[in-house]
Amino acid sequence: MHSTLSRLLVLLILLVSMGCEDEKTNETDNNLPESGTIHGAITFNGTWPETGQVLITLDTNYPPQGPPSGFEYLTAEGLTDGEYNYSFSNLSFRSYAAISVTYWPEGYPNGSYNSLGGNFQDMDITQDDPEMEINFSANFE
């Protein structure tokens, strides 16, 4: 009987101590973002090419040095009234130097390319400011 009573007492103490909170935390501290997003719309001017590839890239340096932080192949089917909505998500908190749109007549990464447009100003993604909208134009002319 003494052993059973001791076990119940220890179990009760454990349950009570685990159920008590030491201190309340601010709810916003628990909801801090873990990554950032850069998104926006590209307005295309001119005629979309019938061959080759159009590519959007996000780079930490400009001119680019090494692989991009993000990229996407763009297609004419993705356009709505001459606009293409893009999004780079799950980004590390840091500064990004450029979003660029390029046209590769012979397909990426072969041959030469034409720069169609972009945003070439620093974009700082931080935990306090994790989302940024960047809209710009790209020209096929």
Where are these regions (language model features)?
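Structured interaction patches on ligand/partner-binding surfaces of diverse proteins
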Residues: D22-E23, Y103-E141
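A short, amphipathic beta-strand motif
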Residues: G36-F44, I56
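Beta-strand-rich domain onsets/edges
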Residues: E21-T37
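Short, ordered, surface-exposed loop/turn motifs in non-cytosolic proteins
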Residues: G46-G70
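Bacterial N-terminal signal peptides that target proteins for export
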Residues: M1-L9
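Tryptophan-paired
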Residues: Y62-L91
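A short, solvent-exposed beta-strand micro-motif common in secreted/extracellular proteins
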Residues: Y84, F88, S92-N110
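C-terminal motif of bacterial Sec signal peptides marking the signal peptidase cleavage site
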Residues: V16-G19
